[in-house]
Amino acid sequence: MYSGEMTMVILLLIGLVAQSNLIAICASVLLIVQFSKMDFLFPYLETHGLELGLLFLLLSILVPIATDRVTTRDLLYNVSSLPGFLSIVGGILATHLNSEGLKLMQIDPSIIFGLIVGSVIGIIFFNGQPVGPLMAAGVAALFIEVLNWFH
């Protein structure tokens, strides 16, 4: 068995043990693609997978606005209040961290395994919520940058 396939099997097992359906499903899908000789899909998934994931994430976030559960009045109040202002600042910082995390994963794709293991530990022991490796990579990039200040 190739190391990529073995890593996917390990991630599948980690996902099952940690009850992280997303990790288990992703590892399973990639194993199926590999074993069914449809590996021509890998470049497409690598190039467009993040965009597709963000598309579905944004769709789920915008549904309350589209269905009027969040009104224009709610939105205006939110952006003009202190919590709303802080959420805007949080969004700015988060997108910057995500950008740095994406750069880190492009420079060193092997870092994803550590991000997933860390996410699983966070889920199991700290009641964390997995939102994907991009934010975890952003935080890791921040830690690496801080460490570089001292070297």
Swiss-Prot record:
Domain of life the protein comes from: Bacteria
Signal peptide region: none
Main localisation: membrane
InterPro entries, A to Z: UPF0756_TM
GO cellular component, one term: plasma membrane
Compartment(s) where it occurs, according to its Swiss-Prot or TrEMBL record: Cell membrane
Record field: transmembrane: 9-29, 47-67, 75-95, 111-131
Keywords for this protein: Cell membrane, Membrane, Transmembrane, Transmembrane helix
Pfam families registered for this protein in UniProt: DUF441
Topology with respect to the bilayer: Multi-pass membrane protein
Family: Belongs to the UPF0756 family.
Protein's name according to its UniProt entry: UPF0756 membrane protein Dred_1676
Native organism: Desulforamulus reducens (strain ATCC BAA-1160 / DSM 100696 / MI-1) (Desulfotomaculum reducens)
